[in-house]
Amino acid sequence: MAVVPLRRLGIVGTGLIGASIGLAAKRAGVGEVVGVDADEGTAQLALDRGALDAVTDDVEADLVVVAVPVAQLPARVRDVLEQTREATVTDVGSTKGAVVAAAAGDTRFVGGHPVCGSEARGPANANGELFQGATWFLTPTAHTDAERYRTLHSFVSSLGAQPIAIDPRAHDRLVAMTSHLPHVLANVVLNQAGATRIEGHDPLAAAGGSLRDATRVAGANPRIWVDIFLDNAEALQAALGEHRRRVEQVEEALAAGDAGFLARWIAEASENRRSMLADAYPDATDLHRLRVHVPDRPGVLAGITQALGAERINIEDFELRHVSAERGGTLTVLVAGADHAARAAALLEAQGYGVVVSAVDE
């Protein structure tokens, strides 16, 4: 599908996502980007950052993106549809049921959800590269005008994202499983550990990598996540019910001493994780993990990444796990190719770092 630059783009809500869309759109050749925000200071900051050409209540445009919090989306989408005559209208919400219903079959509306983001907030942290390679769900309905869908598909592609069409209800079930359920479980596990004392010992103080890895998303911004949970309550409840059934299977296996079931269960999870990595990284079968012990010292991360970059060793992904000021931490680096992994390990060992290399699928 050909990428056709828009003449005018309107953005309603100029926070992190809205301002990032503005920056990316201007790089993609959109003629004019205008925006509005309930907080005038936020809109002005987006303008100062170069994400907007003008701040205006008149967002009539070829395309209007509504990028406000989930709870506000239905009302704001209705407002934009009423206030504009020609614009194709979309949103960026992570749940689709309520906002699609609010559009009431208007042929100009096409739901959207860029699967990306950041723990940072506001236009000060906007990034025009935020959508590069990201999945961007589009949720057309039977009422959606085909030409308007093509307009949005083309625009999303021009930002570097990968547009994927999906039924709105299927979208909400999908994100309930892949995003909302993990957030719920991370909070449950961490709160369970925080509320427990075992013969005077605090589980949080004794936490190892497993607890930290499993609860990375716990405690996310409640102003955002309470609305997401409630807006997708039906799909999330269904996902929790299926989760409960699977946990009960594990409980039954433990009670019966069923080692065979537990072994098959773990093997199935291992295969599913390999499949997930293969989707995220096309060369996942050749990915290698380098675990590097690093001191708690300014500049260590920059030094390692720059050293690998100088040798043209591409870092596919990395994670830094801090232990303490005295013990430093562990830097985990993913590198594609056994040769690159060996070269990276040798380079870092020559600089005095302890390195352990393993294939990701081991």
Locate predicted features:
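NAD(P)+-binding Rossmann beta1-loop-alpha1 motif at the extreme N-terminus of oxidoreductases
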Residues: 1-55, 63
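Short beta->alpha hinge that forms the Motif I/post-I loop of the SAM-binding pocket
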Residues: 38, 68, 92-94
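A conserved regulatory-domain signal marking ACT and ACT-like small-molecule sensing domains
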Residues: 272-362
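Internal alpha-helical scaffold of NAD(P)-dependent oxidoreductase catalytic cores
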Residues: 130-219
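Rossmann-like NAD(P)(H) cofactor-binding subdomain of soluble oxidoreductases
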Residues: 76-125
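Interdomain hinge/lid region at the active-site interface
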Residues: 199-270
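Rossmann-like NAD(P)-binding element
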Residues: 57-88
